[in-house]
Amino acid sequence: MSHQQPPSYATEPNTMFVQADPSNFRNIVQKLTGAPPDISSSSFSAVSAAHQKLPLTPKKPAFKLHERRQSSKKMELKVNNITNPNDAFSHFHRGFLVSPVSHLDPFWARVSPHSAREEHHAQPDKEEQKAIAEKGFYFLPSPRSGSEPAPELLPLFPLRSPNGTNHRIHEDNHRDS
C-alpha cells in the first residue's frame, strides 16, 4: 500500500489560509487587512478600527450616459477670424473656408500654374450663363476628344442574351408548349 501525501505548496511565511462562509467573509478580510487585533478587544472593535483607518474621501460619482450627451451639446467650434485680407496664408476666400491645398487659396494661386482647363472653368462665357439660367444646371465639357465615337449604351433590360440567341429561342419553345 502506498501512502500518498497531499501536494505541498510553496508559501510565503506571511500567507494565511482561512476558510470562511460568505456571511462573514467581509469581516474576516477586514480583520486580516487591518491593524493587528488586540487579544482583549472584541471582533466588533477590530472591524470598527479597520473602518476608522480608511481615508474619508468623497466617492466619485458614477458615470452617467445622459451627462455625456448633455456635455456634447455644449461644444462649440471656434473659427479663427483673420482680419487682414492680404495675408498670404489666409484660408478664407470670398467668404467661405477652402482647403489649405485648394486652388482657390490665394497663396496656392500665386505658386501653382493654372492649366487651361482650370481657366476655362473659372470664367463661364455668356452662352454657358444663359444655359444655366434656362435649365438650372450645366454640363461640363467631356474629357474625351471629339474624334472618338460616342460609347454604346446598353439596354437596361435586354431581350436577348449577349452571348447569342439561345436564350430567346428557349423562351419561344416554352410559349409554344
Curated annotation (Swiss-Prot):
Chief location bin: nucleus
InterPro entries for the chain: VQ, VQ_4/11/13/19/31/33
PTM (free text): Phosphorylated on serine residues by MPK6.
Bias-annotated ranges (Basic and acidic residues): 115-133, 168-177
Localization: Nucleus
PTM sites of type Phosphoserine: S43, S99, S115, S142, S145, S161
Bias (Low complexity) ranges: 148-159
Keywords assigned by UniProt, alphabetized: Nucleus, Phosphoprotein
Region (Disordered): 115-177
UniProt short sequence motif VQ, positions renumbered to this chain: 25-34
Membrane-crossing segments per the record: none
Domain of life where this protein originates: Eukaryota
A GO CC term attached to the entry: nucleus
PANTHER family: VQ MOTIF-CONTAINING PROTEIN 11 (PTHR33402:SF19), VQ MOTIF-CONTAINING PROTEIN 11-LIKE (PTHR33402)
Physiological role: May modulate WRKY transcription factor activities.
Protein name as catalogued: VQ motif-containing protein 11
Organism (species): Arabidopsis thaliana
Lineage: Eukaryota, Viridiplantae, Streptophyta, Embryophyta, Tracheophyta
